[in-house]
Amino acid sequence: MGRPRKKKFPRPSPIPSCLPAEQGGESVGPRVKGRLVMKKDVAVIGVGQSSFVRGYEGSIRELAFEAFREAMRDAGITQKDVDASVFCSAPEYDKQRSPAGVLAEYLGLIPQPTFYVESVCSSSSTGVKVGYSMIKSGLHDVVVVLGFQKMSEITSAESQERMGRGADIQWEAPFGTMMPAYYALYAQTYMAKHGLTHDDLMGVRLKSSTYGVINERAVYRKAVKPEDFKQGDPEAKLAGPVAWPLRVGDCCANADGSSCIILADAKKAKVLSKKLVWILGIGAASEAVNMAARPDFAKGLSVGYGAAAQAYKMAGITSKDIKVAEVHDCFTIAEIMAYEGLGFAPVGEGKQLVREKATYKEGKIPVNVDGGLLSKGHPIGATGGSQIRTIVLQLRGEAGPMQVPGEPDIGLVHNIGGVGLYGNVTVFGR
C-alpha cells in the first residue's frame, strides 16, 4: 500500500476588508434631523486605572484593587450591585494560577460568577466583548471587567522570551523570533513597498511623547526630540537598533498596571449612573499564528480591517464619524498600520497622517492623545481597558489636559493581541 495522500485544507476566506463603512463613505445608521440614532443597549458606567509603573511593590491583589476602587467610585456602586466579573491577563506573566477566583475574592465579588479571559495584549478588550455578550444575553445586568499585569518581576530579556510565546512556539520562537522582530518584518515591507521612512516612524514616537508628558499615569513621561534618534550619537538612547528598521524609540514601554471597566444593561445603567457612554459596535477577528501563512505584509494586520468592518457595520457608522481613537501602538509601525486598517488612510498612506500631524489632538483624527502604549505603557492584560478608559473620559469631556476639542461624541478603541493574532475594535458613543 502506498502512503496516504495528505489532505489539503483550504485557507479560510478572510473577513471582507472593503465594506463601505471602512472606506469612509456615508454612515449607514438611521438618522433623525441629520443626527445619527445610536442603539443604546449596554453602557460603560465606571472606569478606573492604576498608574502604569515599573517595579510595582505590591501584589496583584493590590494592583487590581487600585483600578477597581476607582471604577466603583466612578460608577457610584458597591459590590452588591455587581452580578458577574471578568478578569483578564496574559498568563505567561502570572505567578498566581486561577487569578480570577483569587482577585474576585479579594475585591468582594464572590459568590457571584467570575470568569478569566486571555488573548495576549488584547485580553481586557476581549473581556469587555465577553462582558457585553453576557449582558446582551440577559444573564447578567452589571459586569466588572478588570485587566491586570505585573511584568517587572523578571528581566527584560526573559520578558521578551515570554512575549514571544504569544507567537508560534513550534516553528518560530525556537529560532529566536520575538515581538520586535515580527513587527520589523512589517516595517521593512512598508519601507520597500510604500516609501515609509525612519522619520515617519520617529514621528509616531514624537507624538506619543507629547501626550505622555502630560499623562500623570504614564510610565514614560520624558519629552522626546528628533536628536534622541540620531544614529551614532552615544547620548541618543532611543537610536539603538533593536530589529532593523526598529530602534529603541520605536518600541513600547512594558509596565505593571491594572484597568477596570464596569458595564451595565440600559435599564440598570440609567438608574445607577448619569454619565453614560454606550457601546455602539464591537468587532473581533483572528489570523494565522504562523507568519508564513499570512498572505500580504504590505497591507498590515488583517485583523484590524476585519474587526473594524464589523464594528462600523454594527454601529451604523463609517471611519469618518470617529472623533477620537486609541490604537494599539506597541511599535511605531503598528500605529501606522492601524490608521489604514481603521479606514483613516488608504493602504500604504498611513504615513501621510504622520507627516501632516493629522493625529495630534487638534488634528483631523486625534489618535492616542494619552501617550499610547509607546509612552503611557503596555501592561499587557490591562492595556485594552486603559484604552477604553481614555475614550470614555474623552466622550464625557473629562480628559483634562488631554481632552480633544470640539466635544467628541463617537470614539474608537483598536486593540491587537500578539502579532495580529487577535484584533478587537470597539466603538463608543454618548
Tell what function each PLM region has:
Residues Y93-V102, M291-D296, D329-Q352, P379, ...:
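Short glycine/threonine-rich loop-to-helix capping motif typified by GTGT followed
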Residues P20-S27, R31:
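Short Gly/Ser/Thr- and charged-rich N-terminal loops/segments
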Residues G34-S122, Y190-D200, K207, V219-K230, ...:
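Conserved active-site "lid/cap" helical segment
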Residues S89-V143, K150-Y182, K222-A253, A285-E287, ...:
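Conserved catalytic cysteine-centered active-site region
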Residues G34-R61, I169, A173, G203, ...:
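Condensing-enzyme catalytic core mediating Claisen C-C bond formation in acyl metabolism
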Residues E118-Q149, A181-N215, I261-K268, P379-A399:
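Active-site-proximal alpha-helical scaffold in enzymes
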Residues V44, Q79-C88, P113-S119, V143-F148, ...:
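Beta-strand segments within the central parallel beta-sheet cores of soluble alpha/beta enzyme folds
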Residues G2-R3:
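Cationic, amphipathic, low-complexity segments that mediate targeting or membrane/lipid association
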